[in-house]
């Protein structure tokens, strides 16, 4: 069975850091497009950036070849520079022996990276990239909503 080629654009936003936050993803495959977004009452920008990637990859039922555009160097570097693999090897500790932040989200991401063939592409945020700008609008709209749920993994 051949893999579908999927293009994903993601962004996360936080109004204050920590503060209310939102995430968004635009997914394209075979001429179809889908927008996903959500948010939490109290979270961080990095959690929202990771969650945007997670939610997009979790939405893909079958293994896919994914080209993922993000403005988050944190997410991209964690995967491409093998920080994630190192954190796992070190019992979820950083190089200076501190607990890895956002471990709950990283642990959800690991099997998705094994399931899908994901290639990250960095885009400069707020530089006029149409899909990144659209994701930013969606993420900010989510962060601005009233009655957002609590982020179960956020710790101050």
UniProtKB/Swiss-Prot annotation:
Its EC number is 3.1.26.4. Mg(2+) 1 binds at residues 11, 49, 71. Keywords: Cytoplasm, Endonuclease, Hydrolase, Magnesium, Metal-binding, Nuclease. Mg(2+) 2 binds at residues 11, 136. InterPro entries: RNase_H (IPR050092), RNaseH-like_sf (IPR012337), RNaseH_domain (IPR002156), RNaseH_sf (IPR036397), RNaseHI (IPR022892). It is found in: Cytoplasm. Its cofactor is Mg(2+). One of its GO terms (molecular function) is nucleic acid binding. Binds 1 Mg(2+) ion per subunit. May bind a second metal ion at a regulatory site, or after substrate binding. It catalyses: Endonucleolytic cleavage to 5'-phosphomonoester. Residues 2-144 form the RNase H type-1 domain. GO terms for cellular component: cytoplasm. Pfam families: RNase_H. GO terms for biological process: DNA replication, removal of RNA primer. Endonuclease that specifically degrades the RNA of RNA-DNA hybrids. PANTHER family: RIBONUCLEASE H1 (PTHR10642:SF26). Monomer. Belongs to the RNase H family. This is Ribonuclease H. The lineage of its organism: Bacteria, Pseudomonadati, Thermodesulfobacteriota, Desulfovibrionia, Desulfovibrionales.
């Amino acid at each position: 069975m051949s893999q579908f080629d999927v293009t994903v654009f993601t962004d996360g936003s936080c109004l204050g850091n920590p503060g209310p936050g939102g995430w968004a993803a635009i997914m394209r495959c075979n001429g179809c497009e889908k927008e996903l977004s959500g948010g939490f009452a109290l979270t961080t920008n990095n959690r929202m950036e990771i969650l945007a990637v997670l939610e997009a990859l979790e939405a893909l039922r079958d293994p896919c070849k994914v080209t993922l555009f993000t403005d988050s160097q944190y997410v991209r570097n964690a995967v491409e520079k093998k920080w994630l693999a190192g954190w796992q090897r070190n019992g979820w500790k950083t190089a200076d022996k501190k607990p890895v932040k956002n471990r709950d989200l990283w642990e959800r991401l690991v099997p998705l990276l094994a399931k899908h063939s994901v290639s990250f592409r960095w885009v400069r945020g707020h530089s006029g990239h149409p899909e990144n700008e659209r994701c930013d609008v969606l993420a900010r709209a989510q962060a601005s909503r009233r009655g957002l749920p609590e982020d179960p993994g956020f710790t101050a």
